[in-house]
């Protein structure tokens, strides 16, 4: 009798353990901690009107932005998953946040659900679609963002209260989003809506973005339309890429402010551990006194390992008019700069 009871109990425990193991295998959960620590020194001429030079350390990172992030994912079965991402930026020099408003997860903060076939829907603070697509066509792949003009010209870098759908249909990457403005009685004010695509076929990439937002300027919300087109082609270790971006801010008291950015360049993988990048970026602003800015950049990155990179960069900026303006804060005719540093991933 006792043997039969113990046999029954043992069978029940084994069945329960098997069920728990099956549930564990069915619902795999992972949380990854990641980040970047980047320290660089930059020498720049004509940093102020009158020709003064300056040596600085951008503690937010040159080659990559300094960040600390948490990436979580739970397997829900049948190709479905729940996921989240929290990411903040920090100042390497003093350990503080890289923003003055004290936002803890200022870089990214979103949660969503995804499927291998049907794509993902994410909600929260996220990169804009223009940011996602432009990074594919930037010759520097969005390295040196404090120096290059693309992130600040990409229809905003991030959206708050954003609902984004993303999927890959074979060779086509497709994204669409709606950032809620949160203004009572007005669905448009403060809102951003955009759509973007990038098509990849062998060595060729072609993509574009269109977006419209109503941004608060002073006490009024102004319409702001944006579009971008990019193309890239790979020839062995060399990738040639470029694009054009245009933004139309509908100012009420004056002609619209139109900002155009054209860019192009190459990325050459000389060896698996050495990468050369070069590019030219031209920005024109219709109502800016400086009118036009041209930026030429070359860089060399040496990978000590998969996680550690030594980098150097030289850039030259010229202005059509040497006057103080938003486009030309120092009011100089040209500037030359050199940057060196180290970038570590974890």
Predicted regions: what they are:
Residues 52-56, 96, 149-150, 181-182, ...:
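Extracellular loop and loop/strand-boundary signature of outer-membrane beta-barrel proteins
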Residues 53-66, 104-107, 157-161, 189-193, ...:
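Residues that define the transmembrane beta-barrel architecture of outer-membrane proteins
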Residues 39-45, 88-92, 127-129, 171, ...:
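Transmembrane beta-strands of outer-membrane beta-barrel pores
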Residues 302-304, 316, 333-346:
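Outer-membrane beta-barrel "beta-signal"
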Residues 192-298, 302-303, 316:
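Detector for outer-membrane/organellar transmembrane beta-barrel domains
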Residues 28-43, 55-181, 189, 198-202:
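Outer membrane beta-barrel
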Residues 31-39, 82-86, 121, 174-176, ...:
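Transmembrane beta-strands of outer-membrane beta-barrel proteins
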Residues 21-27:
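Sec/Tat signal peptide C-region and signal peptidase I cleavage site
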């Amino acid at each position: 009798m006792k043997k039969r009871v113990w046999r029954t109990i043992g069978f029940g425990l084994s069945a329960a353990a098997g069920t728990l193991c099956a549930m564990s295998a069915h619902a795999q959960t992972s949380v990854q901690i990641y980040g970047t620590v980047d320290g660089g020194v930059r020498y720049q001429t004509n940093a102020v009107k009158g020709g003064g030079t300056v040596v600085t350390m951008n503690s937010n990172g040159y080659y990559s932005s300094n960040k600390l992030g948490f990436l979580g994912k739970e397997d829900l079965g049948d190709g479905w998953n729940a996921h989240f991402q929290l990411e903040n930026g920090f100042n390497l020099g003093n350990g503080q946040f890289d923003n003055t408003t004290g936002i803890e997860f200022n870089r990214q903060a979103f949660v969503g659900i995804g499927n291998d076939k049907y794509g993902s829907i994410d909600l929260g603070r996220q990169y804009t679609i223009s940011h996602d697509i432009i990074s594919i066509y930037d010759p520097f792949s969005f390295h040196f963002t404090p120096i290059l003009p693309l992130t600040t010209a990409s229809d905003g870098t991030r959206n708050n209260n954003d609902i984004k759908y993303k999927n890959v249909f074979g060779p086509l990457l497709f994204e669409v989003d709606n950032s809620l403005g949160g203004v009572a009685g007005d669905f448009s004010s403060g809102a951003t809506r955009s759509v973007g695509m990038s098509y990849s076929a062998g060595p060729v990439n072609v993509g574009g973005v269109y977006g419209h937002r109503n941004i608060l300027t002073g006490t009024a919300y102004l319409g702001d339309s944006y579009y971008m087109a990019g193309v890239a082609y790979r020839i062995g270790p060399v990738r040639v890429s470029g694009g054009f971006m245009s933004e139309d801010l509908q100012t009420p008291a004056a002609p619209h402010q139109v900002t155009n950015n054209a860019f192009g360049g190459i990325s050459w993988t000389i060896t698996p551990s050495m990468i050369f990048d070069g590019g030219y970026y031209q920005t024109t602003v219709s109502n800016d006194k400086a009118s036009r800015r041209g930026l030429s950049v070359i860089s060399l990155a040496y990978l000590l390992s998969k996680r550690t990179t030594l980098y150097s960069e030289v850039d030259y900026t010229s202005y059509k008019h040497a006057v103080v303006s938003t486009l030309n804060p120092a009011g100089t005719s040209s500037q030359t700069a050199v940057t060196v540093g180290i970038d570590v991933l974890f």
